[in-house]
UniProtKB/Swiss-Prot annotation:
Family: Belongs to the AdoMet synthase family.
UniProt KW Ligase keyword: no
UniProt binding sites for K(+): E45
Compartmental location: Cytoplasm
Note describing how the cofactor binds: Binds 2 divalent ions per subunit.
InterPro entries recorded: ADOMET_SYNTHASE_CS, S-AdoMet_synt_C, S-AdoMet_synt_central, S-AdoMet_synt_N, S-AdoMet_synthetase, S-AdoMet_synthetase_sfam
Residues holding L-methionine: E58, Q101, D253, K284
Protein's UniProt name: S-adenosylmethionine synthase
NCBIfam families noted in UniProt: metK
Catalysed reaction, written as an equation: L-methionine + ATP + H2O = S-adenosyl-L-methionine + phosphate + diphosphate
Length: 400
């Protein structure tokens, strides 16, 4: 590797990873509630370990959801359907401990500070306040068609492919738990030029040999996903490098909702505000504002206003307007960052109520995001992935 080149690595996990099981359970419960009560307040946390699922949190809703059934259906769909996998949807215990949202938090969310103090316009009076303080980041760059960094894009595609060949029985000996990792080499212009390393660890049946797993994964998982022009004779492969991965899922490691926030976002390529997504309704800005920030960043890059763009939003609990908006184009901007913030403020309503309306977030669309990333998903129709504002932004920022 020449002196001016650098390596960057991102990882992904499959839907059978213990932490991802929890994310999917939390978002399945959220979706079931939103189907019947779009205005519900949900903060649902899940923990899994050998033979046990614990669902806890704060839920305020007018509807009833059969939580144990939702939990079991989700685990079954992931593929933990036999006791020999160490976790079984039919026989695992499901415990629930659910409270209502705190009245102190609710008063700030139900009516924003601006409404309580009379500083909002009539049009704004119904706006909700942010459900918490915090900072959220959104990012986009032009490394891939979906405007995501290449390392996380490839890591997710490998994880998704790993699940596909398990579920369609191409590799019937695979089991649900798995992880992927991709290291990309960048040149001195910060352009990806080759794949340096691919790591895949997958749970498997005990009778299969390591040699067969390595051969099959190269043929059926890596080859269909990783662009051949980025692979050379120096590319390294580590496939099940421990030699054996039979004990996996919640039997191998306990899992928790919100433990895979870098996998969920940009693979470490952009900054992260620290808040997790799954199990939270859209009044929680941890989720909705991170989606809005991605929407803004993606439209800026799609408009040709920058090759790379990171957007930061920040909120105070119970206050509707963001306390700050920051944009960094890393020296690639075609307009000043001040100008970009100006056109963003003019074209995106970044109050919580505005985000919910702009992205139509009171729908049951969340479970599908709970594995393989919330961003850059061409296989899903996600509102924050649209580039419908790109033309307007270009016109207003550059006058063309």
């Amino acid at each position: 590797m020449s002196q001016n080149r650098r390596l960057f690595t991102s990882e992904s996990v499959t839907e059978g990873h213990p932490d991802k099981i929890c994310d999917q359970i939390s978002d399945s419960i959220l979706d079931e509630i939103l189907k019947k009560d779009p205005n519900a307040r949900v903060a649902c946390e899940t923990s899994v370990t050998t033979g046990l699922v614990l669902v806890s949190g704060e839920i305020t809703t007018s509807t009833y959801v059969d939580i144990p059934k939702t939990v079991r259906d989700t685990i079954k769909e992931i593929g933990y359907t036999r006791a020999k996998y160490g976790f079984d949807a039919e026989t695992c215990a499901v415990l629930t401990s659910i409270d209502e949202q705190s009245a102190d938090i609710a008063q700030g969310v139900d009516k924003a500070l601006e409404a309580r103090e009379g500083t909002m316009t009539e049009e704004e009076l119904d706006a909700i306040g942010a459900g918490d303080q915090g900072l959220m980041f959104g990012f986009a760059n032009n490394e891939t068609e979906e405007l995501m960094p290449l390392p996380i894009s490839l890591a997710h595609k490998l994880s998704l492919r790993l699940t596909e060949v398990r579920k369609d029985q191409t590799l019937a000996y695979l089991r649900p738990d798995g992880k992927t990792q991709v290291t990309v080499e960048y040149d001195d212009q910060n352009k990806p030029v080759r794949i340096d390393t691919v790591v895949i660890s997958t749970q498997h049946a005990p009778e299969v040999t390591l040699e067969q797993i390595q051969s099959d994964l190269k043929e059926h998982v890596i080859s269909p996903v990783v662009p051949s022009e980025l692979i050379d004779e120096q590319t390294k492969y580590f496939i099940n490098p421990t030699g054996r991965f039979v004990i996996g899922g919640p039997q191998g490691d306990a899992g928790l909702t919100g433990r895979k926030i870098i996998v969920d976002t940009y693979g470490g390529y952009a900054r992260h505000g620290g808040g997790a997504f799954s199990g939270k309704d859209a009044t929680k800005v941890d989720r909705s504002a991170a989606y809005a920030a991605r929407y803004v960043a993606k439209n800026i890059v799609a408009a040709g206003l920058a090759d790379s763009c990171e957007v930061q939003l920040a909120y105070a609990i119970g206050v509707a307007q963001p306390v700050s908006i920051s944009i960094d184009t890393f020296g690639t901007g075609k307009a000043s960052e001040e100008k970009l913030i100006e056109v963003v403020r003019a074209n995106f309503d970044l109050r919580p109520a505005g985000i919910i309306k702009m992205l139509d977030l009171r729908r049951p669309i969340y479970k599908q995001t709970a594995a393989y990333g919330h961003f850059g998903r061409h296989d899903l129709d996600l509102p924050w992935e649209k580039t419908d504002k790109a033309d307007t932004l270009r016109q207003e920022a550059l006058g063309q």
